[in-house]
């Protein structure tokens, strides 16, 4: 089945949305600015599939940017949300469910001794860096170019995700004062981190890093990079903050730390989580060492709060999702991700399209580049984004929904069945031909359309 390029219902909805919503969307990457055309307005999802406002079905390789690891409308999650809603949607009080969810996170991720629930990954990272500053009494945060930690002002400098998609170096509204205590370094450059600590180590409160950089496309840490950050933080009395909003409970039951730090014998001081832990509803968390978390109000002086933190519906969805994420689920997701990545790479190879496929666990992305490696933001930006746009639209027309940006990770779910994979395989050759037909000027700075 080939999906026509036109989408009258989505066209109409987008026109209506642009009158009342800035840019017509509630998060920039959804607007298709990087690939052109009209964003598809989705009305329902089931398993690995989405249905748009025109009634057309797509195999989904976005999975709500990661949370839908079990697929859409998983019966256990739907039942949990329905039952929770019947009991009341919000109380503004502690609930038994939030204790259970916190206990489950602490049980799965050993270095997390205490955890605080919030509503979004942005809240989690914002709170984690405030806590790190409050605990150490130091002002400076080190982050890495291309890593995205939400839209908190102090961390939006040289960020990935939508900032990369739109080709923005920074954003108006973030003042110099807000980022004055933020140092941005190239990702995977441990020597430069070491030099920075040597010069300013007594001012650095924390280093925050995505466990795997996945908001400039997927760029795994080089061997020893994360462990090196741990060593340098220890040597200078700084905290290491691991942003596992994307990888947490997605690449394994214990997140990326379980695949790397747990094996190598080191751990961050603080973690941030989101996406999968909310089961598709707004939920996130930050947690870590008990002595650090003890500085949070009301136990300590570092203030953090939220009216809807620990919302009963989000907690119920998160509990149902995490409980359903068995070792078998992770094995299935890993296998399906490898299948899809292999199909796409084979199709591009057959058409002679230069590309690089990066992966970390079940996260992967395709860079349209002739480089032999992409290890940082500068390398991620040197790709032919016009080819990605052509590939994207051909797949979309064939009923496969990809991330509408070359700077985002691709996701599969445990619900991606043989039929879904076969549809991807059927669509990939034509998409590769479409990419091959496009010239390859290198896009530096996001390639916004």
Curated annotation (Swiss-Prot):
Alphabetized GO MF terms: glutamate-1-semialdehyde 2,1-aminomutase activity; pyridoxal phosphate binding; transaminase activity
Keyword Cell cycle: no
Annotated pathway: Porphyrin-containing compound metabolism; protoporphyrin-IX biosynthesis; 5-aminolevulinate from L-glutamyl-tRNA(Glu): step 2/2
UniProt keyword annotations, A-Z: Cytoplasm, Isomerase, Porphyrin biosynthesis, Pyridoxal phosphate
One GO-annotated biological process of the protein: protoporphyrinogen IX biosynthetic process
Enzyme kind, highest EC tier: isomerase
Pfam families listed in its UniProt record: Aminotran_3 (PF00202)
N6-(pyridoxal phosphate)lysine modification, residue list: 275
InterPro entries: 4pyrrol_synth_GluAld_NH2Trfase, Aminotrans_3, Aminotrans_3_PPA_site, PyrdxlP-dep_Trfase, PyrdxlP-dep_Trfase_major, PyrdxlP-dep_Trfase_small
Catalytic activity annotation: (S)-4-amino-5-oxopentanoate = 5-aminolevulinate
Gene3D superfamilies, per database record: Aspartate Aminotransferase, domain 1, Type I PLP-dependent aspartate aminotransferase-like (Major domain)
Any one cellular-component term (Gene Ontology): cytoplasm
Primary location group: cytoplasm
Protein location: Cytoplasm
Cofactor: pyridoxal 5'-phosphate
Protein origin, superkingdom: Bacteria
Keyword Acyltransferase belongs to the record: no
E.C. numbers: 5.4.3.8
Subunit structure: Homodimer.
Family listed: Belongs to the class-III pyridoxal-phosphate-dependent aminotransferase family. HemL subfamily.
PANTHER family associated with the record: GLUTAMATE-1-SEMIALDEHYDE 2,1-AMINOMUTASE (PTHR43713), GLUTAMATE-1-SEMIALDEHYDE 2,1-AMINOMUTASE 1, CHLOROPLASTIC-RELATED (PTHR43713:SF3)
Name listed for the protein in its UniProt record: Glutamate-1-semialdehyde 2,1-aminomutase
Source organism of the structure: Parafrankia sp. (strain EAN1pec)
């Amino acid at each position: 089945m080939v999906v026509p390029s036109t989408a009258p219902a989505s066209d109409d909805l987008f026109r209506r949305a642009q009158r009342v919503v800035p840019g017509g969307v509630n998060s920039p990457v959804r607007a298709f600015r990087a690939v052109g055309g009209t964003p598809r307005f989705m009305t329902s999802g089931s398993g690995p599939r989405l249905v748009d406002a025109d009634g057309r079905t797509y195999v989904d390789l976005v999975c709500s940017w990661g949370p839908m690891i079990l697929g859409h409308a998983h019966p256990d999650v739907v039942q949990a949300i329905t039952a929770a809603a019947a009991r009341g949607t919000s109380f503004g009080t502690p609930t038994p469910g939030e204790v259970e969810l916190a206990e489950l996170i602490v049980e799965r991720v050993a270095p997390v001794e205490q955890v605080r629930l919030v509503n979004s990954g942005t809240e989690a990272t914002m709170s984690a860096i405030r806590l790190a500053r409050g605990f150490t009494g130091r002002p400076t945060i080190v982050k890495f170019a291309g890593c995205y930690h939400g839209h908190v002002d102090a961390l939006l400098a040289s960020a990935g995700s939508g900032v990369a998609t739109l080709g923005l170096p920074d954003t108006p509204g973030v003042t110099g004062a807000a980022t004055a205590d933020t140092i941005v370094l190239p990702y995977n450059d441990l020597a430069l981190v070491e030099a920075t600590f040597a010069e300013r180590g007594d001012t650095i409160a924390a280093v925050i890093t995505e466990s795997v950089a996945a908001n400039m496309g997927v760029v795994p840490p080089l061997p020893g990079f994360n462990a090196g950050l741990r060593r340098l933080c220890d040597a200078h009395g700084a905290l290491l903050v691991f942003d596992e909003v994307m990888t947490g409970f997605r690449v394994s039951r214990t997140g990326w730390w379980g695949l790397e730090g747990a094996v190598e014998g080191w751990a961050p001081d603080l973690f941030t989580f989101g996406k999968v832990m909310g089961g598709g509803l707004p939920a996130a968390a930050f947690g870590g060492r008990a002595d650090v978390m003890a500085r949070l109000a009301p136990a300590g002086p570092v203030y953090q709060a939220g009216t809807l933190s620990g919302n009963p519906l989000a907690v119920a969805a998160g509990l149902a999702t995490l409980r359903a994420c068995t070792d078998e689920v992770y094995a299935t997701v890993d296998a399906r991700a490898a299948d899809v990545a292999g199909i796409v790479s084979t199709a591009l190879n057959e058409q002679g399209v230069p590309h690089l496929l990066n992966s970390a666990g079940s996260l992967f992305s395709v860079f349209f580049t002739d480089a032999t490696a992409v290890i940082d933001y500068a390398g991620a930006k040197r790709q032919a984004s016009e080819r990605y746009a052509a590939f994207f639209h051909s797949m979309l027309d064939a009923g496969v929904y990809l991330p509408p940006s070359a700077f985002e990770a691709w996701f599969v779910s445990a619900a991606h069945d043989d039929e879904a994979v076969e549809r991807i395989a059927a669509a990939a050759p034509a998409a590769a031909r479409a990419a091959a037909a496009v010239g390859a000027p290198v896009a530096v700075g996001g390639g916004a359309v």
